[in-house]
Amino acid sequence: MSTVHEILCKLSLEGDHSTPPSAYGSVKAYTNFDAERDALNIETAIKTKGVDEVTIVNILTNRSNEQRQDIAFAYQRRTKKELASALKSALSGHLETVILGLLKTPAQYDASELKASMKGLGTDEDSLIEIICSRTNQELQEINRVYKEMYKTDLEKDIISDTSGDFRKLMVALAKGRRAEDGSVIDYELIDQDARDLYDAGVKRKGTDVPKWISIMTERSVCHLQKVFERYKSYSPYDMLESIKKEVKGDLENAFLNLVQCIQNKPLYFADRLYDSMKGKGTRDKVLIRIMVSRSEVDMLKIRSEFKRKYGKSLYYYIQQDTKGDYQKALLYLCGGDD
């Protein structure tokens, strides 16, 4: 395995263990922060005839998540009302969705998105897959804790009752957040063994040994798997993504593809999802909002750079073309600038 690959692997992981604001986030803590003043200004904005959305957007998209929690606390102390409820009544449409998302902690936001993906008839597998495949161990463990707190049931139980077959097994294994952490020692023998096992369990045989794929892809560290997928190419005529498309179908195929893309390059994975949410006619606002809200303090700067590199125009430009009004303003602030 080349040293270059090892360095790239290390670089791709920095800033990844990131519920705390990361160096690659577009939203930073506001320097002259005053929760009381912000709470008062938001209260005035809500009371203004027609609602002063601009002030609400300016404040909440330019504060860190921690600062927003302080504003919500100060607002409740001032008015004896919950800030989220007040804003829910004052705002509507996509802007409301963005602002209410920003008021939740990262784990509360993910937990509520997961719950919504499994509520009612049918499952929104796309959202379930995106969140479960892209979060770190630490993030998943916090999501599990908060999910139980919010909904009085286990995330795993809800996943089990809403999914089936191998797709269920994969989602349950990932949701536990028990993947090995990246170590300083590189085990080349195990890399080779895993690459061969993935090939033997899939492309090489008739039918697929899905449990073998699940165990390797949900238990090994991200850095280890990046090397495994490289090594895999020396055994298989197809790369890992092509092999998945040949071997499995439906939700399971979609989940494995998302997972491998996240492991290979998470910022690029999100750049692709953002592009897909805006290309062609109509916008898949739910996906667009979720990524802009959830990655703004994690790796938005990396996502922007991957987006520009792959699609030739900036993420900022695409958002400008695809959205309008104060909703657009909020997303552009979260994007953090043009490239």
UniProtKB/Swiss-Prot annotation:
UniProt xrefs under InterPro entries: Annexin (IPR001464), Annexin_repeat (IPR018502), Annexin_repeat_CS (IPR018252), Annexin_sf (IPR037104), ANX2 (IPR002389)
Changes after translation: ISGylated.
Keywords: Acetylation, Annexin, Basement membrane, Calcium, Calcium/phospholipid-binding, Extracellular matrix, Isopeptide bond, Phosphoprotein, Repeat, Secreted, Ubl conjugation
Gene3D superfamilies, per the entry: Annexin (1.10.220.10)
GO BP term, example: positive regulation of receptor-mediated endocytosis involved in cholesterol transport
Residues that bear N6-acetyllysine: 49, 152, 227
The keyword GTP-binding is annotated on this UniProt entry: no
Renumbered ranges of Annexin repeats: 33-104, 105-176, 189-261, 265-336
Pfam family, one: Annexin
GO cellular component, one term: cytoplasm
N-acetylserine modifications at: 2
Residues annotated with Phosphotyrosine modification: 24, 199
S100A10-binding site, as annotated region: 2-24
Cross-link (Glycyl lysine isopeptide (Lys-Gly) (interchain with G-Cter in SUMO2)): 49
Phosphoserine found at: 26, 184
Cross-link (Glycyl lysine isopeptide (Lys-Gly) (interchain with G-Cter in SUMO1)): 49
Entry domain remark: A pair of annexin repeats may form one binding site for calcium and phospholipid.
Quaternary structure note: Heterotetramer containing 2 light chains of S100A10/p11 and 2 heavy chains of ANXA2/p36. Interacts with ATP1B1. Interacts with DYSF. Interacts with COCH. Interacts (via repeat Annexin 1) with PCSK9 (via the C-terminal domain); the interaction inhibits the degradation of LDLR. Interacts with CEACAM1 (via the cytoplasmic domain); this interaction is regulated by phosphorylation of CEACAM1. Interacts with APPL2 and APPL1; targets APPL2 to endosomes and acting in parallel to RAB5A. Interacts with S100A4. May interact with UBAP2.
Protein task: Calcium-regulated membrane-binding protein whose affinity for calcium is greatly enhanced by anionic phospholipids. It binds two calcium ions with high affinity. May be involved in heat-stress response. Inhibits PCSK9-enhanced LDLR degradation, probably reduces PCSK9 protein levels via a translational mechanism but also competes with LDLR for binding with PCSK9. Binds to endosomes damaged by phagocytosis of particulate wear debris and participates in endosomal membrane stabilization, thereby limiting NLRP3 inflammasome activation.
Protein name from the UniProt record: Annexin A2
Gene symbol of the encoding locus: ANXA2
